[in-house]
Amino acid sequence: METWEVIASVKEATKGLDLSLDHPLIIKSEDVPSNILQLLQQKNRRQLKHICMKSRKEYFLLEEYGPGFWVKWPYNYFNGYSLPERRTEVVTTVERERAKRETLKTWDELKFKELLHLWSEEPKGSCKLEKDKDLKLDMNPPDMKGESKINDYYSDPKEYIESKYYDALFSIHTPLAYFVKSNLVRLKNTCRTKYGSDSYKIAYQAMLQKFLLSIVQFKDRHDNRLLLEPFSSPIADEKRKNCLTKFVIQDENKNSSTIADLCVVLKSREIKLQILLLLEIIGLNDLDWNFRDFEKKYKLKLKKRSLNLTKKGLVRRRSKKKTSEKDKGIERITTSLDYCEQLDLYLDRACILDILLSSETPNPDAIEASNGTIQEHKKNILDKSKEASLVGFINYVLIPYFNKKVPHAVEFIIQKLKGPSMRPKRALKKVNDSTNVSSPNTVETYNRLSTSQRASRSSIINSVPSSPALRRVDANLFSRKSIASPTPELLNSRTNSNLNEFLESETRSLKRPSQLGRTKSDLTMNHLQKRQFSVSDLSTTRVPNSSTITLKTPFSHSTINAYKTMNNSFRRVGKRKDINETIRLHERVDSEENVQVQATPAVKKRTVTPNKKAQLQSIIESPLNFKDDDTHEGRKNTSNITSTPTNKPPENSSKRRVRRRLFAPEST
């Protein structure tokens, strides 16, 4: 009698079971022993797969498919190590997941027996992939033809930089930024890997120097159109042929306009490539500091270069000595290549080429159908927003990739390509800190002054105008230095014009306006500010007075004269009042103590002498100068005084010139 035994129950059939997936068998529940069937139909075993043994000879896997049917998967080879470590743990701990079961009617309708062949697994899919057979991922579009270009892999860094240099030269549609950020970086990493981190810079610089061209070599290459000739290197010659094939240029036809435009484009690109190589070498050798004062360090070389470029005479007096090829080779070897000067020469070449292209007149009739791309790239050289132009070369290549490495060289290139500026340089404003620190002599002199003199000094300080021309005064605070007028003789002349005040307020550099004459116009009133000189300076006569006070200070070259109020007439300043002429309340001077026009220095009140009273009798009092506290006799006397000049004949008034005062002192 055959005996069944359940060895283990697993949730998933692993690859290590080694089942025979080609020959599954379907058995009914009646064929399974009753004790085994009750064990398999427990709640915690319904979703599991059961590893069973029959008569200790046959091993198979039972899996329930619907009510009343089981699928039997035989073993190819049974390995006891493939079973779980604890056979009972799998059965007891795994719980059945609650799910909706299909009814018997649903399973009968599906007829899953017919679908068993679709559920079979392929044994190849379960096997591990061999190491030799790697998957090849093909990401090409389905409609793409098999003409995709495969990038060449160069293990040798010399071949790599040669390929990328001529690729950047002849591929005019490729931006030069890729040559810096991709090709040069990859070359440096390749040299570091091959030659080590200690000596890779020497090999890296030697490879870059191989593609540096002197000015003579550059001139021979582009003047003779050697780029269109076959190269000795197969890599460079392949790049040249691809460029000519792309623009449908034949080697026989070398005089067409297409080739001429292509030569100009290639010349512009190689100048920029040479600049990039030079900047990389300058950064490796730490030569960036030479560009801080390039003109001073290379003064002799620049002067020698300018002498070599001077034009010679048409008739040569002496025959030129012929030099052999050996001598030329010796000269080239002996002359060392200065990278900084070489960079300056290439920048000159770039500026000259840019000027020639900008001055060239375009001919639209000469443009051929196949010449559109070259013509478009030639126009981009003059377009500042494109990378092909000099400005775009600075913005898109030099500044992003070389500004941190060689900042002074980049600044020198920017100034060189920008050209000389026609604007005058602004003079730097020198800030004098001496105004903030007062000397001890100034403080002592101020303390020695009396109270009235200090008040007069403070009024002078507060009357400084807001005009910028008049603000240019000395550093001292207590001296008043009037600016000399260009025409001092006009100050004492009798005129009704305001030109004197206008000239007084300006600097010495201001010339006398020749078109302004004697006029009563108020056009110059806008330029007038508060008075910076005494009222008596405008009088026609100077009367010396014994009561003149002379103050000599160490911070003033001129003598400060404080005159007493005399019988000289006041002069009207103007009709308008400036905003800056407002006086603070605590700085106003009482009219009973002092008589002055606005911003005139205050004078201490003096006792009135009999002679002074006699002088005051001739003053015509202003009708607006009445006081409320005056006595009746004072008003009567003033009325008599005002009536006396009107009764005089005009002959007497013509002998003496009397001007009207704005404010008259009180006669006490």
Curated annotation (Swiss-Prot):
Listed Basic and acidic residues bias regions: 626-636
KW Ligase (keyword) present: no
Coiled-coil residue windows: none
Compartment annotation: Nucleus
GO cellular component: chromatin; chromosome, centromeric region; DNA replication preinitiation complex; nucleus
BP GO terms, sorted: DNA replication; DNA replication initiation; double-strand break repair via break-induced replication; mitotic DNA replication checkpoint signaling; regulation of mitotic DNA replication initiation
One Pfam family named in its UniProt record: Sld3_STD
Keyword Cell cycle belongs to the record: yes
GO molecular function: chromatin binding
Region (Disordered): 429-450, 621-668
Positions with biased composition (Polar residues): 433-450, 637-652
Organism domain of life: Eukaryota
Keywords: Cell cycle, DNA replication, Nucleus
Note: Present with 125 molecules/cell in log phase SD medium.
Oligomeric form and interacting partners: Interacts with CDC45 and SLD7.
Function field: Required for loading and maintenance of stable association of CDC45 with chromatin during initiation and elongation of DNA replication. Also involved in temporal regulation of origin firing. Required for the association of PSF1 with origins.
The protein's name: DNA replication regulator SLD3
Annotated organism of origin: Saccharomyces cerevisiae (strain ATCC 204508 / S288c) (Baker's yeast)
Gene for this chain: SLD3
